[in-house]
Amino acid sequence: MCGIVGYIGTEQAAPIILDGLSKLEYRGYDSAGMAIFDGEKINTRKAVGRLKVLENLTHGGENMKGTSGIGHTRWATHGAPSDINSHPHMNNAGTIAVVHNGIIENYIPLKKKMQDKGYQFISETDTEVLAHLLDYYYKGNPLEAITKV
């Protein structure tokens, strides 16, 4: 089952998110990832396998600087377990990161709509469509964009 952890504060986010994800390991998952905002851009790291793989990749979160972020453990429902299909998913500009728990039943027509508008998809997941929809609807007000999505 998927797990989601988020953090906004004054401490470095990545180690806190990794700790939070470790508390969800008992639920089962096939991959893990996180997105950390460093004040200028969003950096993501994703890995198939146990959380330890992501911890090693990020040196316990030490090489992902920033005080806000999201993390996710994934149990695949759309798309095979892979680094690309792991969450978080980004919009094409790399300015929006999304994690999601559940199934988007109508993601195929939504994906087609966004592809017709020029959005490029790299994963096989239903969640990636959310990042592109948020990008499409965002006009300066995040709550308005989320409501429209």
Could you describe each region identified by the protein language model?
Residues M1-V149:
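Conserved short alpha-helical segments that host acidic/polar catalytic motifs at enzyme active sites
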